[in-house]
Amino acid sequence: MVTAAGSPSSSSARKPASRPRLPCRDILVHIEAYLSRRDGVDNLLKVSLYAARLALALAAGQPPLPHAATARLRSFESSVGLSRKAFRLGKFVQSINALRAAAYHPHPHVHPLLVLLAYGGQGVYNFLEQFAWLAKAGLLPARLLPRRLHRIGVWAQLLAHVGSIAIKLEEVAELECGVEARLEEGCGEESEVVRTLSRKLLLKLMSLVQDMVDSAMTVGDVTGRKGLLGSSTLMASAGLLSALISVHKNWNSC
């Protein structure tokens, strides 16, 4: 019904506007965008690596895989692992840039030491991995890569995980407070601002789980794979979970 002035009636004016539907993105365009990123390709290699390790761990049971199939899986695992090391140079530069950004724009609620642990430790690990890649690729003599250098890299990675977990716990707490504050202000759970904060919170929680899984795997490297952390099936499953979380995060961000 329309009033005499030609304007909609109050009942129709109070009718909420329908949310505009976002156009569906072409799947091939999305895949192209995903694979054009360094992290996208690295994620797929990571999934392949831990899937192969899980297959090898399961193949050790009964009945075992044929010897030829096991040899192919081991060769594939080794090749994929070497390929992933080539991506560590870009991640090293990313860690340096993250440290620079944190120095110019420090987080008000995160201690600088945690930032140094997270990005500095990851940077040291990725830097040392370049020597491992060059040695395994045959450019550097293997004797130039002592076991001590590998242990330094593993310890640096463990410190990076500790710093990253502490930072993400703070960020999760901030996002949870943000969601609660918006709800107390009267924003409904279906409001755009609450939905956006909830999506960010979910992704941050997934990143936190990934860091915890990765840190458990790194502890296994530090301790020499003793006890529960020595289970090949458990560690391969943990690595595959971490890889799938990476795929999900990067797929949604591109």
Swiss-Prot record:
It is found in: Peroxisome membrane. GO terms for molecular function: identical protein binding. InterPro entries: PEX11. It is a multi-pass membrane protein. GO terms for biological process: peroxisome fission; regulation of peroxisome size. Residues 1-113, 248-254 are cytoplasmic. Residues 135-227 are lumenal. It comes from the Eukaryota. Coiled coil: none annotated. Keywords: Membrane, Peroxisome, Peroxisome biogenesis, Transmembrane, Transmembrane helix. The chain crosses the membrane at residues 114-134, 228-247. Involved in peroxisomal proliferation. Belongs to the peroxin-11 family. This is Peroxisomal membrane protein 11-2. It comes from Oryza sativa subsp. japonica (Rice).
